[in-house]
């Protein structure tokens, strides 16, 4: 069985999303959980890449890093005002179910 996608949630993502993913057996870390609170976006993205985790964020700065050519393990991006927690959770579960880490590498999924 291929390796599943793993996620890293930045500090602005609601903790209920991490809880929902974990309840479904999906590997997820959070900024607070790995002591990266206050880290720069570049440091967050480097951590996620080193751990082969897709970065989940609403922060446009990650899109700019992608445009600048900064390598990453994938970005799942959404605007918080456009999606409910349940919608974001369902979208991440779908990404986890149908995409591989290789398919997400240096790719952005807009939720």
Predicted regions and their residues:
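Acidic, PIN/NYN-like endoribonuclease modules and their adjacent C-terminal/linker elements
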Residues: 1-11, 15-24, 36, 42-45, ...
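A short beta-strand-loop structural module common to alpha/beta enzyme folds
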Residues: 27-35
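Acidic, metal-binding active-site segment of PIN/NYN-like and related structure-specific nucleases
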Residues: 49-66
């Amino acid at each position: 069985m291929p390796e599943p996608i793993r996620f890293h949630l930045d500090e602005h993502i609601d903790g209920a999303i991490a809880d929902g993913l974990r309840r479904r057996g999906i590997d997820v870390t959070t900024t607070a959980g790995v002591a990266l609170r206050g880290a720069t976006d570049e440091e967050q993205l480097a951590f996620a890449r080193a751990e082969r985790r897709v970065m989940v964020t609403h922060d446009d700065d990650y899109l700019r890093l992608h445009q600048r050519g900064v390598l990453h393990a994938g970005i799942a991006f959404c605007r918080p005002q456009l999606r409910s927690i349940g919608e974001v959770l369902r979208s991440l579960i779908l990404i986890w179910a149908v995409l591989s880490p290789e398919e997400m590498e240096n790719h952005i999924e807009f939720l």
